[in-house]
Amino acid sequence: MRKLTVAAVQMSCSVNPEESIKKADALVMEAVNKGAKLILLPELFERQYFCQERRYDYYGFAKPVMENEAVKHFLTVSKKTGTVLPISIYEKDGNVLYNTVAMLDSGNFLGIYRKTHIPDDHFYQEKFYFTPGNTGFKVFDTSVGRVGVGICWDQWFPETARSLTVNGAEIILYPTAIGSEPVLNTDSCGHWRRTMQGHSAANIIPVAAANRIGTENVTPCEANNNQTSSLTFYGSSFITDMTGELVESADRTSETVLVHSFDLDEINAARLEWGLMRDRRPECYGDIVR
């Protein structure tokens, strides 16, 4: 038996990165005290979701991985607590900017995953800020198991989850920043959850999604060309079992630490017994890569 205890942290985010990191630290320690060894924070939790507006000065938020304040802080936390912490950041690599997760394990930096699928509409203007990732779908060999990571919009694509599972992931994590959909005029929360529950079921793999909460408003100014915008992030973070069943679930408004334990050996055996990886026919799937 290989026991994995995972936590998904749901939190509101401040305009002040120091405040956000301090809050995230307290929630991570709450997860540690509940026995978690793999702890997921939301996407870009250092500050409010700046992608609501287009501002050239916000490019300055991006830093090289090891110069990022959240990475530096949580590298120490991971060493002190013996935990695995995927940290979502705005990365600068040379003159290229990415939406990135840095994987930290017990004081060690294991590498990065860069967001593959970049969304764009009036309220989620990520193409203005991020270049599509060039890392491929990464599975990290950590002290608690093989961990696959997708970032927010990646979670809507079944190819992400299948690629991670084929590459040996034993759990999939999705740091997220999602909420109201003013352009679509819909409440996407149920759709959002069911999408990842389906990925979990189809791959016989647990999934954890950590979302932010709260309403974040954009103030019109010259720097953003007088844009008006507001998003209410709907939380609803969750953890599924290997069949896609919700085993832990947060509400829409509360700061929450969800914790659940799995037997990875049991899950891996079940995946083999189902034969889903065995019975794949990659030679027949050309239509989806046109």
Model regions and ranges:
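N-terminal active-site segment of His-dependent metallophosphoesterases
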Residues: 1-38, 173
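Short, glycine-anchored, charge-dense loop/turn motifs used at functional sites
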Residues: 6, 103-110, 240-247
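Short glycine/proline- and charge-enriched loop/turn segments
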Residues: 53-61, 121, 222-227
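A conserved C-terminal secondary-structure "cap"
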Residues: 265-290
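Short beta-strand scaffold segments in enzyme catalytic cores
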Residues: 87-89, 100-103, 138, 237-239, ...
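CN hydrolase (nitrilase-like) catalytic-core segments centered on the catalytic cysteine
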Residues: 66-84, 152-256
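Active-site catalytic loop in hydrolytic enzyme cores
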Residues: 63-66, 76, 92-198, 273-274
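Cys-nucleophile CN-hydrolase/nitrilase-fold catalytic domain and related Cys-dependent amidase chemistry
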Residues: 17, 26-112, 178-205
